Amino acid sequence: MREYRPWGWFELLERGDDFLVKKIHLEPGQRFSLQFHRHRTEHWIVIEGSGLITQGNCEVECQPGSTFTIGIEQRHRAKAHDQGLTFFEVQRGTCKERDIVRLEDDYGRTQKMPLLDMLI
């Protein structure tokens, strides 16, 4: 089942005790929040389209076959170019949707998190 977001959509493909696999699609020109996660790592495998990946202080162009490993608390973002961007995301660790700290967001979703939310 697809879950729609302002930037596109994702499908949950598989879930285990300490992992989660999603297929993610960003619509042309859209991007994720600049964000990090406190309790999980992510591995991205690009399968369609192209875009720009921000990882830490680096920006890298991506295309099908590109892979990225994002560490715990590492700032990251994906941005789609003109044809969109689709990739698989494999999360390892505590895989909860609310484990997202947004630093910048095009859709007005940045906010100060209550202390309890930060301790997920």
Identify what each model region corresponds to.
Residues 57-75:
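Short acidic-glycine-tyrosine-enriched beta hairpin
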Residues 1-36, 40:
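A short glycine-rich, His/Asp/Glu-containing loop-to-beta-strand
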Residues 1-5, 77, 81-120:
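Double-stranded beta-helix
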Residues 23, 43, 58-61:
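Short, surface-exposed secondary-structure edge patches
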